[in-house]
Amino acid sequence: MSRSYDSRTTIFSPEGRLYQVEYALEAINHAGVALGIVAKDGIVLAAEKKVTSKLLEQEESAEKLYHIGDNMLCAVAGLTADANILINYARRVGQQYLQTFNEEMPCEQLVRRVCDLKQGYTQYGGLRPFGVSFLYAGWDHIRGYQLFQSNPSGNYGSWQANSIGGNSTSVQSLMRQEYKDDINLDEASAMAVKFLSKTLDSNSLTHEKIEFATITKDTTKNKMVCKIWKSDEINEVLNKYQETQRQS
């Protein structure tokens, strides 16, 4: 019976479900995992980089982590093409706010604007939901460091630590057991490596398999630093984690 409700985005099933939104969520469950952890001095984003073929040329640029503005980064899980559209939209909205008010847009206000667009694609005929979830990491003078998660329905929430994509349930279970409010950025980075190593189907992590990004505040210049890590920086944190594992 439910098949007659599948093709139309805007029609609820008798059980009150929107199947197209559920299918979009299912696409995210087949994507690589991405996670975010808030520390007292910054935020860590980490993501699995899936290598589909040995013949594929490896790029230095990240494919799951993106800059949105000077005070905000994001991680994505799902359809990358859909993510690119929403990221470009978020960048335009942020730049328009910056030009108008001469300051960076508050994080939650920007997340809400993007989620309003995503929600519209679940409500109008002839459209389909965006098949991508986001983790937004940012800072503003109102609430400090913030981590938001959003899904194709347009819902969003604020978190201290969360994950999206495949194996996200396992990562969230580990987060509930091990996350603490007073960790610093180095501890959060080590925790992110630990969570990825326990959930990915791999004997050893390398910079080719994961991506890292951090957002911190440079107190000397009084500005935010949103940084997507290079290969040697990722290897450094991986080596530290492996050394800790050997000693334990």
UniProtKB/Swiss-Prot annotation:
It is found in: Cytoplasm; Nucleus. GO terms for cellular component: cytosol; nucleus; proteasome core complex, alpha-subunit complex. Disulfide bonds: none annotated. The keyword Metal-binding does not apply. Keywords: Cytoplasm, Nucleus, Proteasome. Transmembrane segments: none annotated. The keyword Transmembrane does not apply. SMART domains: Proteasome_A_N. It comes from the Eukaryota. CDD domains: proteasome_alpha_type_4. It holds the Pfam family Proteasome_A_N. One of its GO terms (biological process) is proteasome-mediated ubiquitin-dependent protein catabolic process. Gene3D superfamilies: Glutamine Phosphoribosylpyrophosphate, subunit 1, domain 1. SUPFAM superfamilies: N-terminal nucleophile aminohydrolases (Ntn hydrolases) (SSF56235). Belongs to the peptidase T1A family. The 26S proteasome consists of a 20S proteasome core and two 19S regulatory subunits. The 20S proteasome core is composed of 28 subunits that are arranged in four stacked rings, resulting in a barrel-shaped structure. The two end rings are each formed by seven alpha subunits, and the two central rings are each formed by seven beta subunits. The catalytic chamber with the active sites is on the inside of the barrel. The proteasome is a multicatalytic proteinase complex which is characterized by its ability to cleave peptides with Arg, Phe, Tyr, Leu, and Glu adjacent to the leaving group at neutral or slightly basic pH. The proteasome has an ATP-dependent proteolytic activity. This is Probable proteasome subunit alpha type-3.
